[in-house]
Design a protein with these regions (language model features):
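Short beta->alpha connector loops at strand-helix junctions that form conserved
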Residues: 1, 11-13, 63, 169, ...
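N-terminal leader/targeting and accessory segments in enzymes
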Residues: 1-20, 24
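Short, polar loop motifs at secondary-structure junctions
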Residues: 1-3, 150-154, 170
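Short secondary-structure transition/capping segments
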Residues: 3-9, 73-75, 122-123, 178-179
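Active-site regions of enzymes building and remodeling cell-envelope glycoconjugates
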Residues: 5-12, 161-169
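Residues that form or immediately flank small-molecule/cofactor binding pockets and catalytic motifs
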Residues: 13, 64, 151, 170-173, ...
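Phosphate-binding loop of NTP-binding sites
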Residues: 16-145, 150, 154-163, 193-196
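Adenine nucleotide phosphate-binding catalytic loops in nucleotide-utilizing enzymes
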Residues: 126-127, 163-210
Length: 210
């Protein structure tokens, strides 16, 4: 039963309406937004990215792995006048899903961790997965950074003159990880870029985290 007072809005699809409201709310704020996706590693990469960005800017991020059309607007609603940046994780299992998410998010930078076999039953092949993941570029402005894993065979083939594509990796990439040393609970490595080296220690183990 409806309460006798208050406003109610009837919509055809509550999930689509929630995403549309989130997109409208996000459009009120002129802030940089990092959007990231990938077959695996999305949530860990989101956490690392938000820590780096958050070291300088007041940053909001996707909570847990709430990365679909219901969870994503909940993150967008966290933005307020003090927010300086956002890191948004995007998941999908069908074509068109990331397209709808970026329409609401309006990212200014995008990152793809890898192309594996997750949801291949819905997308037909790894090429289909690549196509679906690249929907993340639909919301990017021309010239925006597009950061890709150069060690992934599918992502390494991506070319698009509309964006500033940057590859990272251990074997291939403009940004490369070298001198990797795994310890009991940490991993040391060097990030090398155009002859410059930055030593990094992360509080976890595993080359996949590097």
């Amino acid at each position: 039963d409806l309460t006798p007072s208050g406003a109610f809005v009837k919509v055809e699809n509550t999930a689509k309406a929630l995403l549309a409201l989130g997109g409208y709310y996000r459009s009120k704020f002129n802030i940089p937004v990092v959007a990231l996706t990938g077959s695996v590693g999305k949530t860990t990469t989101k956490e690392f990215t938000s820590l780096v960005v958050g070291a300088k800017y007041k940053t909001i991020k996707t909570q847990g792995n709430l990365n679909n059309e219901i969870g994503l607007p909940q993150t967008l609603f966290q933005i307020d006048s003090s927010t300086q940046a956002a890191v948004i994780e995007m998941g999908m299992n069908h074509f068109g899903e990331i397209s709808r998410l970026v329409s609401a998010t309006k990212p200014t930078l995008a990152l793809i961790t890898n192309i594996g076999v997750s949801h291949i039953e819905n997308l037909g092949s790894r090429d289909g997965i690549l196509k679906a993941k690249l929907e993340i570029t639909e919301g990017l402005p021309n010239g925006a950074p597009l950061i890709l894993n150069g060690d992934n065979d599918k992502l390494a083939t991506v070319k698009n003159d509309n964006f500033n594509i940057c590859f990272y990796g251990i074997e291939n990439g403009e940004f490369k990880a070298e001198n990797i040393v795994e310890r009991d609970s940490t991993t040391d490595f060097d990030i090398v870029y155009r002859g410059n080296t930055q030593h990094i220690t992360i509080p976890t183990i595993g080359v996949h985290n590097v």
